[in-house]
Each structure stands twice: as structure tokens, then as C-alpha cells.
Amino acid sequence: INLAPSPLIGKNISELGTRFPDMSEPYSKEMIESAERIFNESKICFHKGTYVCVTGPNLETPAEYKFLKIIGGDAVGMSTVPEVIVARHMNMQCFAVSVITDLGIEGKIEKVTHEEIQQAAKKAQPNLITLIKKIID
């Protein structure tokens, strides 16, 4: 779910893609199946869900987390969606993986620093390296 400005605002470069790319199926089912197989074979825990992109650079309030859940979001961040929109604009196949660094669950929300978010992401790095190496092969 994109709640940020579209990266396609401005003059379209038709050599790169159509003005209004179809986003009804932004992620490649084949790539998702490959990633799931790799995660399962590597015994890496994963979950599927709906990602919401916001502008940031602030972290969300409890009320915002609640709103994002109501509209169908399972995870929230400030990236990924613009890159997917651009990839689909260029007719590229893609999928997305996110590292969940903190919980926005009502009653479980704790203050978190950017440094703590970076540490959680760094902890997930070996699993992401495994996925990327195997998906490229």
C-alpha cells in the first residue's frame, strides 16, 4: 500500500515504461515461490503480509499503527514500494523482502531508536545474504 508520493510523478520517459503501469499484481509469483522455497530449505522463518509505505522520516504513533492495520497493513516502512513501482513501470519482475525490526502491535509498542532498528536489521543480514545468493543462482 503506497501512502507516499509516487516515484513516477513528473514527465514520463516512455522508453522506460508506460505512463500508468498496472499495479494489480506487483510481485512475481514465481519469484515469491522461489524465495519461499529457499527460506524453507534454509530453515529461515518468514511471514507473508501487506507492506505499507509512508514518507517518514519519523516512526509511527500508536494511532498510525492502528490506522495502518485497519487499511490492511501488516508492516510499515519508508522504502520498498517506490522501488517496486519503478520496477513495474519498467516491466521488471520483482518481489520484496522486509526485515521487521520493531512491533507496532497495540499494547506491545515500545520506544525504539534508529540505532536499535539498524541492529535488528544487521542481525537479519546473514539470512538475506543466503536468500540473495540462492535466488541469483
PLM regions and their residue ranges:
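Glycine-rich phosphate- or other oxyanion-binding loops that anchor nucleotides, phosphorylated ligands
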Residues: I1-D137
